[in-house]
């Protein structure tokens, strides 16, 4: 089947990511530093073992590992892993050294510098940042990210540019950088049960190779976030969140697994940095994908239905995941490739789209098209909105219990006179 997801084994759900403490090159002796403050190398740790220093405290004093200002926060775990390997033990059996204050890092800003300006928090750029700038993109802040606001032509104003982008997308095809969306890997035998408890709508019967749009509520019954989750296998999902709520949603999922449902066999891992995302939207979007993938049949209407998910390869040998998802009302797809391949994938898609009369579009046009469709935007999800306010009350399940399922039924949150989000036809 074209839409069947296949992947190599990764060691079971309990070891989705293997630990790597040292990069070794056969036939070469590398000098690898593990404590840059005191110039401690991997060979220093092995020398300590050969000299008979088997205690971690002896290792620390022989090599000065972890005796600098960071008190081992940077390199100790690697040193302990190498010592454990030399002793033939587990890291937990080797033990740790005694840490001295500060036990946790102290921000330099807490000691000096009261005016921080734009340095108050980091500014994140997508793998397509330079590509967008090279194609006349005007950037704006979205959460912590820099994203294209609009792509002006020949001195266009913001209003001129976003109207043209929206009209072109609805008429032919448009490409949009959506890398900033939060991306979370949900893995484990109980992953389906976990998502079914977190989302207000049903996920228990979601088939492999399909995606579903979900609404996540807080305990008080108000909307926390929305996004899609793709089922990649029996035990693995790929969840997307809004840009602004990526970190809060990740923290919320971790809290639920650690404090409420610690019996569930589930791991959640942020993979936002690992994938570059490109939305391909418009009546000609399928034609663009057919010209860009190695097997055009995998994206035809019969093999790739609405909310379907496939794993395929682009013509420039780039592996990718594609979901048939639309947030603008048109036929649309989301294409995710490994981050380093983002510019190359965009070059390929744009090389096909531009001759067809397609365009690049930014957040302003995306917001306009979402409003026309009646789909919630970031402005609506401000922590004071109910699922009924968002016009999505019918999605909420009446057959299961989920986070916020009780308090969302409070009279004040379900009154008929409350404002409702509706679509505006273009």
Question: Which ranges hold each PLM region?
Answer:
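Acidic, proline/glycine-enriched N-terminal capping motif
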Residues: 78, 85-217, 222-224
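Residues forming anionic-ligand binding surfaces in small-molecule and nucleic-acid pockets
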Residues: 53, 163-179, 223-236, 268-271, ...
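Conserved, structured C-terminal
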Residues: 125-129, 133-134, 147, 233-235, ...
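Residues forming the flavin
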Residues: 1-123
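Well-ordered mid-protein domain cores that form the structural environment of catalytic cofactors
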Residues: 202-256
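Cofactor-binding beta-sheet edge motifs in enzyme active sites
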Residues: 22-40, 46, 68, 145-148, ...
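Catalytic cores of large soluble enzymes that bind and process phosphate-bearing ligands
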Residues: 33-40, 48-51, 67-75, 116, ...
């Amino acid at each position: 089947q074209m839409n069947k997801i296949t992947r190599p084994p990764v060691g079971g759900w309990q070891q989705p990511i293997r630990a790597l403490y040292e990069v070794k090159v056969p036939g070469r002796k590398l000098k690898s530093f593990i404590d840059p403050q005191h110039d401690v190398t991997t060979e220093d740790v092995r020398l300590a073992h050969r000299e008979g220093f088997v205690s971690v405290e002896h290792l620390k004093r022989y090599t000065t590992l972890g005796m600098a200002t960071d008190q081992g926060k940077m390199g100790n775990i690697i040193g302990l892993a190498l010592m454990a390997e030399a002793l033939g033990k587990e890291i937990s059996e080797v033990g740790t050294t005694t840490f001295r204050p500060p036990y946790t890092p102290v921000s330099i800003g807490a000691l000096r510098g009261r005016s921080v300006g734009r340095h108050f928090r980091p500014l994140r750029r997508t793998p397509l940042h330079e590509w967008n700038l090279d194609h006349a993109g005007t950037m704006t802040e979205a959460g912590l990210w820099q994203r294209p606001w609009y792509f002006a032509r020949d001195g266009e104003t913001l209003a001129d540019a976003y109207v043209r982008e929206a009209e072109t997308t609805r008429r032919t095809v448009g490409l949009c950088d959506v890398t900033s969306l939060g991306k979370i890997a949900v893995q484990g035998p109980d992953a389906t049960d976990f998502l079914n408890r977190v989302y207000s709508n049903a996920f228990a019967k979601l088939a492999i190779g399909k995606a579903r749009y979900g609404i996540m509520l807080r305990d008080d019954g108000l909307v926390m976030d929305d996004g899609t989750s793709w089922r990649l296998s029996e035990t693995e999902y790929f969840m997307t969140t809004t840009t602004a709520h990526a970190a809060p949603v990740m923290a919320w999922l971790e809290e639920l697994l650690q404090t409420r449902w610690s019996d569930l066999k589930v791991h959640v891992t942020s993979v936002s940095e690992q994938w570059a995302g490109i939305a391909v939207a418009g009546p000609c979007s399928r034609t663009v994908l057919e010209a860009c993938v190695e097997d055009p049949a995998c994206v035809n209407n019969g093999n790739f239905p609405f909310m379907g998910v496939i794993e395929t390869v682009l013509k420039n040998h780039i592996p990718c995941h594609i979901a048939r998802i639309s947030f603008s009302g048109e036929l649309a797809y989301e294409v995710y490739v490994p981050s380093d391949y983002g510019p190359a994938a965009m070059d390929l898609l744009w090389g096909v789209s531009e001759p067809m009369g397609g365009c690049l579009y930014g957040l302003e046009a995306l917001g306009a098209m979402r409003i026309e469709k009646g789909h919630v935007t970031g402005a609506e999800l401000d922590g004071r909105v109910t699922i009924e306010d968002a016009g999505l009350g019918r999605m909420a399940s009446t057959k299961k219990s989920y986070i916020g399922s009780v308090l969302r039924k409070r009279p004040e949150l379900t009154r008929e006179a409350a404002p409702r989000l509706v679509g505006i036809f273009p």
